[in-house]
Design a protein with these regions (language model features):
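A preference for well-ordered globular domain cores
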Residues: 1-128
Length: 128
């Protein structure tokens, strides 16, 4: 589970321009965008690849867009509570010797690194 491997779910054309990281929508929700990247493509009738817009991961929340609320929303977009508890429980079983499983340790470490990367991303993007 890598933060930069979350697939883009939003695309913006050149007319719209680069999307804002945080935006309040008309319905009272907030959109938080991350992994914003240039999107390249070959427009109809052309042969050369050019920038056709932007792509990013977009999360909508009706809660106040705090670091904690956005972190929860992003985690839930890739991992539901049951799967998260399973990671923790499998790791604890291994540590306590109930069910030895080295894969549980690796999976939990990967999850912890994901949450750490997410913390860094949120601090960097929300402080600007």
């Amino acid at each position: 589970m890598k933060l930069n491997s979350i697939e883009a779910n939003a695309h913006y054309d050149m007319a719209h321009g680069m999307p804002a990281v945080l935006e309040r929508d008309n319905d009272g929700s907030h959109l938080y965008r991350f992994n914003i990247e240039v999107e390249m493509g070959i427009p109809d009738g052309q042969e050369k690849e050019v920038q056709i817009g932007w792509k990013c991961c977009e999360i909508r929340t009706f809660n106040k867009p705090t670091k904690a609320n956005l972190k929860k929303a992003i985690i839930r977009s890739v991992l539901d509570e049951t799967a998260e508890f399973d990671l923790v429980n499998s790791y604890n079983k291994h540590v306590l010797g109930v069910a030895v499983d080295e894969n549980a340790v690796a999976a939990y470490k990967e999850y912890l690194q994901f949450t750490e990367d997410l913390d860094v991303l949120l601090v960097n993007t929300l402080s600007n």
